[in-house]
Amino acid sequence: MASSIVTSSLKPLAMADSSSSTIFSHPSISSTISSSRIRSSSVSLLTGRINLPLSFSRVSLSLKTKTHLKKSPFVSFVAQTSDWAEEGGEGSVAVEETENSLESQDVSEGDESEGDASEGDVSEGDESEGDVSEGAVSERAEFPEPSEEAKLFVGNLAYDVNSQALAMLFEQAGTVEIAEVIYNRETDQSRGFGFVTMSSVDEAETAVEKFNRYDLNGRLLTVNKAAPRGSRPERAPRVYEPAFRVYVGNLPWDVDNGRLEQLFSEHGKVVEARVVYDRETGRSRGFGFVTMSDVDELNEAISALDGQNLEGRAIRVNVAEERPPRRGY
């Protein structure tokens, strides 16, 4: 009796179409189906599948078979979402391209602005440099450098003559542009020569005529044209005139430069008096040299002092021989 009731109640289910709504005649089945629909509403929306209780396994089989034969809405849903993803991807690419284009516009505008600024800076800098160079040229035109031909060599300077004293001396011949005494770097002492640059060649020639063989502090100056720049400078010649220089021999050991100068100053003006000393012991070698101012005084000193007794020794006085120049190897 029970099996006939179940069979008769399941016939409408087997004949029903899954696409149309199904009317169940048995109240327990309909209530069970409705409760299962409420519990699995999210699943039925995706798959369209109706889950029945396990007690009715045959009905569940028939329903599963029919739902698989139908076209699953889940596939279409996935396809639609794939299309949306592609559309979204295209849209994102378009957005990125738009952003890139905007950024490129910003960069190009920035480059143009920077380029304009740099061009402005360069042009302003060039103009300012141009002004400075023009000013420098104008200053050079107002203050030209003195001519090399107006530069003079001054030799045989006394060691106490400085650059200021040299300039004051040569101002008697004209305008002095530069006056310089050369000093030893190690000892900071004068080397006995210097250079003077006059304002013109004519004034330089006047200075040569006026101060060559000029007596400055007891020494005769040597003044001539200086060697041009770039050429090898000639060594300053020593001014020891044989006619004015005498040799003094057999001197007592305690006679120094001052005593020798005092002895010869009684017969004229003494330019230089020097006793020769031994470099190792520092003792006098018993001879020296005296330079007189002219030939008359020289001859008078020789006549008066040669053979004279000086502190118990007869000194010898005669004209000094000029030493040959040393050759460098």
From Swiss-Prot:
Stored Gene3D superfamilies: 3.30.70.330
CDD domains listed in its UniProt record: RRM1_PSRP2_like, RRM2_NsCP33_like
Entry keywords, A to Z: Chloroplast, mRNA processing, Phosphoprotein, Plastid, Repeat, Ribonucleoprotein, RNA-binding, Transit peptide
Region (6 X 5 AA approximate tandem repeats of S-E-G-D-X): 108-137
Predominant localisation class: plastid
Pfam families xref list: RRM_1 (PF00076)
Highest taxon listed in the record's lineage: Eukaryota
Name recorded for this polypeptide: 31 kDa ribonucleoprotein, chloroplastic
Native source species: Arabidopsis thaliana (Mouse-ear cress)
